[in-house]
């Protein structure tokens, strides 16, 4: 019991160190480039006269509809960016640091779920290694994790993708989960043109595997794929 408590304390310390360091980096990362465009209802790629701030859900939807027509359909990522651009930067710093922490924890959790649980005693070490790998190998971490416009499109959508995958891999779920897994799949599918199609394909293959190996097809999973597409 004592050994278990010590591991939990070390685990929490690793998480605290990571979230603190990422918060500090977020704190010193300023607004730049696209951030200023997403402060307002989107009309065109560059700021112009008579810009209108996003003041309501209707404004946000209008902005994203314009964005879809003019630029691209990254509804999820740019909605996240526009929401945070209406508040003090510190609000984003706190949430973004937590989301980066969630990315590492999800990768750790999925790796054990997919491969094996027998090495759980080394979980703290694995988690620390995961964050070191993320630090060294994430492409342009300043643009994909710290910059608001980049983080909303890459970090946040990656977490949604992994969360959806984790839900799919779980068995014996409550039928009521569909109330939140379908919206989750929708927002994951509306992430970006790189990871969204890849995860839709991956989860479609998982559904196909279940259909062949276990002679069953989950209706909720099929509905999730439809929502994501």
Predicted features by range, described:
Residues 22-69, 81-82:
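Extracytoplasmic loop-helix module adjacent to an early transmembrane segment
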Residues 66-90, 94:
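Short hydrophobic/aromatic helix or loop-helix immediately within or flanking a transmembrane segment
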Residues 198-228:
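Perimembrane helix-loop-helix junctions
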Residues 97-121, 125, 163:
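Transmembrane-helix motifs of polytopic, lipid-linked glycan transferases
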Residues 161-178, 213-216:
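Membrane-interface transmembrane helices that cradle and orient dolichyl/undecaprenyl
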Residues 177-202:
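Membrane-interface alpha helices of multi-pass inner-membrane proteins
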Residues 1-22, 123:
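Start-transfer (signal-anchor) and selected internal transmembrane alpha helices
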Residues 122-169, 192:
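Membrane-interface micro-motifs in multi-pass membrane enzymes
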């Amino acid at each position: 019991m004592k050994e278990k408590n010590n591991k939990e304390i070390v685990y929490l310390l690793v998480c605290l160190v990571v979230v603190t360091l990422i918060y500090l980096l977020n704190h010193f990362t300023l607004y730049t480039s696209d951030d200023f465009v997403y402060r307002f209802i989107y009309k065109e790629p560059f700021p112009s006269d008579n810009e209108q701030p996003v003041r309501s859900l209707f404004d946000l939807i209008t902005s994203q509809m314009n964005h879809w027509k003019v630029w691209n359909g990254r509804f999820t990522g740019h909605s996240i960016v526009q929401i945070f651009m209406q508040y003090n930067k510190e609000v984003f710093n706190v949430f973004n640091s937590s989301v980066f922490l969630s990315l590492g924890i999800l990768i750790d959790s999925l790796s054990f779920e997919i491969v094996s649980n027998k090495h759980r005693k080394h979980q703290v070490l694995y988690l620390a290694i995961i964050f070191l790998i993320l630090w060294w190998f994430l492409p342009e971490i300043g643009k994909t994790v710290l910059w608001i416009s980049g983080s909303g499109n890459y970090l946040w959508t990656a977490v949604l993708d992994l969360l959806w995958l984790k839900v799919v891999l779980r068995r014996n779920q409550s039928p009521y989960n569909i109330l939140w897994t379908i919206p989750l799949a929708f927002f994951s599918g509306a992430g970006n043109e790189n990871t969204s199609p890849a995860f839709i394909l991956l989860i479609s293959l998982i559904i196909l595997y279940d259909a062949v190996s276990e002679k069953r097809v989950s209706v909720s999973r099929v509905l999730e794929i439809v929502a994501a597409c």
